[in-house]
A protein has these predicted regions:
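Juxtamembrane interface at the cytosolic side of transmembrane helices
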Residues: 1, 17, 283-290, 298-314
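Hydrophobic membrane-insertion alpha-helices, especially the h-region
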Residues: 1-12
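Soluble periplasmic/extracytoplasmic beta-strand elements of cell-envelope proteins
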Residues: 20-26, 120-126, 269-275
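Short coil/turn motifs at secondary-structure junctions
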Residues: 28-30, 130, 300
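Interfacial amphipathic helix/helix-coil modules
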Residues: 252-299
């Protein structure tokens, strides 16, 4: 029993230490993304199609958080791992540490009626030291938060740029269509004026009480005087948008978009139901339990040895 107790103590001190830090994450509250939502409202008001809400931001956060390769890359650049060893040993250590990270959805599909009124995930990391486990979990969460902020803002700016490019091309095309239509209208008015003068129609036909089936291509119902005045007005327009409110509105919106600048707004892509904890109890059986189990095993083996010895003597 004494030998077993000694061996148990040696084993208890030789076993690797394992400490697990945990964090519980949820969809961010409105106030945590208020700056971002204000920018999105401005952009949507100018006709930019932005699909995104707090849930989408949180899902992007979880997606990036769950990436083993991203966690390994962060470990290499974070200074948390001793990079003075050879590359093979370093790679093995990083892979081992990456396997200690777990991301679990707290929703239980077997208990659909007992689900929480919000979505939450539990993130945990197991390290060889208390402070190390908490520090790595904190550092990785901060890194992912930074990556999500960067991607969300880049996506927002990219959507604005695409809308501006599409708006410019659409306006240019519509301007060409309107200019062609105006040129054709002016040419038709010239022909109509010639026809009206040739027919001796100077005043509008309806003012003379006449019912005439007008030519759809070269209308003369206004009379030469009316056609000449209309031709004068159409020819005096320097821009096709002068009498086109739709075109003017689109140009105004485009100018507002071009003047819009999205700053690097700060927002929280995740809400912490539980911040990364400092583990107070190491994983696995404690030294006292190992000692008790070792003594019990030693006692059983000792009793078995004595009984077997007596049986052989008998």
């Amino acid at each position: 029993v004494v030998v077993a107790a000694i061996l148990s103590l040696v084993l208890a001190f030789m076993l690797p230490q394992k400490w697990t830090s945990k964090a519980v994450l949820a969809v961010p509250e409105s106030i945590q993304v208020d700056n971002l939502e204000h920018a999105i409202i401005q952009v949507r008001a100018l006709g930019v199609d932005i699909k995104g809400n707090r849930g989408d931001i949180f899902n992007l956060f979880i997606k990036k958080l769950s990436s083993q390769s991203q966690f390994q890359d962060w470990l290499r650049s974070s200074g948390m791992v001793d990079d003075s060893t050879d590359p093979v040993t370093l790679h093995r250590e990083i892979v081992r540490m990456a396997e200690s990270l777990t991301v679990v959805n707290n929703a239980d599909p077997k208990k659909a009626n007992e689900q929480l009124p919000y979505v939450s995930w539990t993130l945990s990391f197991t390290g060889s030291e208390q402070e190390q486990a908490q520090k790595i979990l904190n550092g990785y969460l901060d890194f992912i938060s930074l990556q999500v902020r960067k991607e969300v803002l880049e996506t927002l700016r990219s959507s604005i740029d695409k809308t501006i490019r599409n708006g410019k091309e659409s306006l240019e095309l519509d301007r060409t269509h309107l200019e062609n239509a105006r040129n054709i209208l002016i040419q038709r008015l010239k022909y109509s004026l010639s026809i009206a003068n040739a027919a001796g129609i100077q005043k509008p036909l309806y003012s003379q009480g006449m019912a005439v089936k007008d030519d759809p291509d070269f209308s003369i119902s206004l009379g030469a005087a009316g056609i000449a005045e209309k031709l004068k007005i159409e020819s005096s327009l320097k821009d096709v948008s002068d009498l086109n409110s739709d075109l003017q509105n689109r140009e105004y919106t485009l100018k507002k978009l071009q003047a819009l600048s999205i700053p690097d707004v700060d927002f929280m892509p995740v809400a912490y139901q539980l911040s990364p904890t400092l583990p107070l109890k190491k994983d696995g059986p404690g030294k006292a339990l190992i000692l008790v189990l070792g003594c019990m095993l030693g006692g059983f083996l000792g009793c078995g040895y004595v009984l077997a010895k007596r049986m052989f003597k008998a």
